Amino acid sequence: LEFIKENALLIGLAVGSGIALLWPMLNRGASGIPNVSPTEAVMLMSRAKPLVLDVRDAAEFEAGHIQGAKHIPLAELSNRMKELEKYKDKPVLVHCQKGMRAKTACSLLRAQQFTKLHQLQGGLAAWQEAKLPIVKSA
């Protein structure tokens, strides 16, 4: 008991660090949708040929996007779900700029029985940070 009192700050830091390290795994497990790093995304793209779904706004998409990405802004996704029907049992790599909109999009797609969803961890920002190519709309 004396040890705990004297080292409460260190114990708190250790517990906090452990939670911070485990959070991505816990978060991934809760959604059931795997987060893939930019490097893993490139491997997925070369092996499984997924639909790359960009759910960012039009201006963001035009400023730069992954080659071959299908653009459906998150705000339009529910109304445009029919465009994606043929991908229900095929790999789909969903991304936005940082990851929050993609997470919402994955939840919407999962509710429509899409079975092979992947989310680009860190979004296009992480893709660009990894020095991977983007293309701009003409």
Where are these regions (language model features)?
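Conserved beta/loop motifs at nucleotide-recognition and modification sites
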Residues: L53
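Short, surface-exposed ligand- or partner-binding patches at beta-edge/loop junctions that are enriched
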Residues: V94-H95
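Rhodanese-like catalytic fold shared by cysteine-dependent sulfurtransferases
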Residues: L1-P50, A58-P91, M100-A138
